[in-house]
């Protein structure tokens, strides 16, 4: 038995005072790298064949990720087995060099500007990419925002795509008096303003053609060009306002100027209004040769028109097209003819010229009491008149909405939805033209119109901006329509009274209210008397106004 190795009994530690293993030293114990933050479920690395694509390292160990102890290796039993593809082979796209190289952080070209590191050359603070340059998207300057365009567009969703131009160039000699942002204006209120009192009524109105109410998409009617003129002079150029200003009132304006101020919180484009203060009298007027009377198109849309100036869909071209459509439509839906009856007011049209055919329009010069010391006199207008079933005369304000390109405007197709879903079409227009519709409503309320007629006019072809068709009409009561579009007249009167009070506190002179082109605020400037004179010479209209203004000051 001596040639066998001796049997040595192993040492077994017996726990005499408790249950379970005894204390054993950690010597020669196998060690597996681990991390306390590792998720439980290590076995899923080799049990589940599907990987988590969103969190690829969800179950990977921080310190032992390179350890292949638990890795699964697949071994093919039959190396000669091949799977035959029976589908149609897809043509592979050619390799595009430098198609996506997010790791090149230096010398990245952004929309015609160069970026070096985290500094952008050619773009100031607040420009493309913000103040952090290309690396402003996240911590490392790449990732989700890099895939969207290197410029951190996640933080620019509400920023204007293109900086808008100001309606008038602010000169160095203009003095800024006040800056009022829209949130402050929205908190204003002037309740219990009574309806205006008629002082003078002028002009003549033609009757509305009720057959136009039958127009629909299937029975459309071509829009005709009406060779008529509507004179829209400014406040100071109005002879009736000049006459009334000598005996009554201390604030004078027109309905479109008042509507612009009342609805300023809904506007995006820049506009300006000239103010003449003479003692206790204030004249709100518009500049000569300005685009104040032109209608805007898709001003409040998410993507307003941004085509170049020469295009038919540029903001300037669309504005002129909408103005002409509105003028022609307001006359075509009336009963035109020498034999047709007309409703004449007390005085004739004050802007009548010999040899010129005037459009159907009547003017009401009305007076409002805006407090103890503010009396407003404004010129308002009607476009037509209609007889109700009871035989009562009702005055009508006629306006037209125009469709130019539903795909480019991202709006509803009128020819498909106007007859069946007219509410959806109107909702789309309220979203894209909120400011324009609000101003039309304010003008109808100020004039005391009984009805507001809205026409839907579309292009015959989206590429032809000269031919149009009428697809339908819709009528509203101005007060009810103001409630539907969330137009608060108490706030509108409060905004007007606030601006008038600011001007009344200033010394006599010339001022200008301007909507900031890129910020939701309005600015008040003190400007020289000859601020808008070309080459230092006054034009004929301005020279005629000087004696009147001097007489008012005296």
From Swiss-Prot:
UniProt subunit comment: Component of the eukaryotic translation initiation factor 3 (eIF-3) complex. The eIF-3 complex interacts with pix.
Annotated domain remarks: The RNA gate region regulates mRNA cap recognition to prevent promiscuous mRNA-binding before assembly of eif3d into the full eukaryotic translation initiation factor 3 (eIF-3) complex.
HAMAP family listed in its UniProt record: eIF3d (MF_03003)
A GO biological process held by the record: cap-dependent translational initiation
Organism expressing this protein natively: Drosophila mojavensis
Subcellular location: Cytoplasm
Protein family (similarity comment): Belongs to the eIF-3 subunit D family.
The keyword Protein biosynthesis is assigned to this record: yes
Function (record text): mRNA cap-binding component of the eukaryotic translation initiation factor 3 (eIF-3) complex, which is involved in protein synthesis of a specialized repertoire of mRNAs and, together with other initiation factors, stimulates binding of mRNA and methionyl-tRNAi to the 40S ribosome. The eIF-3 complex specifically targets and initiates translation of a subset of mRNAs involved in cell proliferation. In the eIF-3 complex, eif3d specifically recognizes and binds the 7-methylguanosine cap of a subset of mRNAs.
Keyword vocabulary terms for this entry: Cytoplasm, Initiation factor, Protein biosynthesis, RNA-binding
One GO location term (cellular component): eukaryotic translation initiation factor 3 complex
Family annotation (Pfam families): eIF-3_zeta (PF05091)
Positions of region (RNA gate): 291-305
Organism lineage string: Eukaryota, Metazoa, Ecdysozoa, Arthropoda, Hexapoda
Annotated GO MF terms: mRNA cap binding; translation initiation factor activity
Record's protein name: Eukaryotic translation initiation factor 3 subunit D-2
Primary localization: cytoplasm
Record region (Disordered): 530-554
């Amino acid at each position: 038995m001596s040639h066998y190795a001796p049997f040595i009994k192993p040492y077994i530690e017996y726990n005499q005072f408790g249950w379970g293993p005894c204390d054993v030293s950690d010597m020669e114990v196998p060690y597996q790298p681990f991390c306390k933050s590792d998720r439980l479920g290590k076995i899923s690395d080799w049990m589940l064949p599907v990987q988590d694509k969103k969190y690829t390292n969800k179950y990977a160990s921080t310190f032992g990720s390179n350890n292949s102890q638990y890795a699964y290796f697949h071994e093919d039993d039959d190396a000669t087995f091949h799977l035959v593809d029976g589908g149609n082979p897809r043509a592979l796209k050619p390799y595009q060099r430098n198609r996506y190289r997010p790791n090149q952080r230096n010398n990245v070209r952004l929309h015609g500007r160069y970026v070096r590191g985290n500094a952008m050359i050619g773009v100031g603070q607040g420009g493309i990419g913000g103040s952090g340059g290309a690396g402003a998207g996240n911590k490392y300057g790449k990732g989700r925002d890099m895939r969207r365009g290197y410029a951190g567009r996640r933080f620019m969703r509400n920023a204007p795509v293109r900086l808008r131009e100001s309606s008038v160039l602010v000169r160095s000699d203009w003095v800024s008096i006040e800056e009022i942002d829209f949130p402050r204006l929205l908190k204003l209120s002037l309740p219990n303003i009574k309806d205006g009192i008629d002082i003078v009524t002028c002009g003549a109105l033609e009757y509305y053609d009720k057959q136009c109410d039958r127009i629909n998409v299937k029975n459309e009617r071509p829009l005709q060009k009406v060779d008529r003129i509507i004179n829209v002079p400014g406040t100071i150029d109005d002879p009736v306002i000049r006459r009334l200003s000598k005996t009554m009132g201390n604030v004078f304006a027109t309905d479109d100027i008042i509507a612009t101020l009342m609805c300023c919180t809904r506007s995006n484009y820049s506009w300006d209004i000239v103010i003449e203060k003479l003692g206790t009298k204030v004249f709100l007027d518009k500049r000569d040769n300005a685009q104040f009377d032109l209608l805007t198109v898709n001003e409040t849309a998410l993507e307003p028109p941004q085509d170049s100036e020469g295009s038919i869909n540029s903001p300037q071209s669309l504005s002129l097209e909408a103005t002409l459509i509105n003028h022609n439509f307001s006359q075509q839906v009336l009963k035109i003819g020498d034999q047709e009856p007309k409703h004449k007011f007390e005085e004739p049209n004050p802007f009548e010229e010999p040899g010129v055919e005037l459009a159907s329009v009547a003017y009401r010069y009305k007076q409002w009491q805006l407090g103890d010391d503010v009396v407003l006199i404004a010129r308002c207008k009607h476009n037509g008149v209609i007889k109700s079933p009871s035989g009562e005369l009702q005055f009508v304000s006629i306006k037209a909405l125009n469709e130019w390109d539903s795909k480019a405007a991202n709006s509803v197709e009128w020819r498909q939805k106007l007859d069946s879903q007219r509410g959806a079409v109107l909702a789309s227009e309220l979203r894209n033209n909120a400011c324009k519709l609000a101003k039309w409503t304010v003008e109808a309320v100020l004039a005391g119109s009984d009805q507001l007629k809205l026409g839907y006019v579309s292009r015959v072809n989206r590429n032809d901006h000269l031919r149009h068709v009428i697809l339908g009409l819709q009528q509203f009561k101005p007060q009810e329509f103001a409630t539907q579009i969330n137009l608060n007249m108490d706030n509108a009167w409060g905004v007007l009274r606030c601006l008038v009070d600011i001007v009344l506190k200033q010394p006599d002179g010339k001022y200008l209210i301007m909507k900031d082109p890129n910020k939701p605020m309005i600015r008040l400037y003190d400007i020289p008397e000859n601020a808008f004179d070309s080459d230092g010479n006054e034009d004929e209209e301005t020279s005629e106004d000087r004696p009147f203004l001097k007489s008012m000051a005296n």
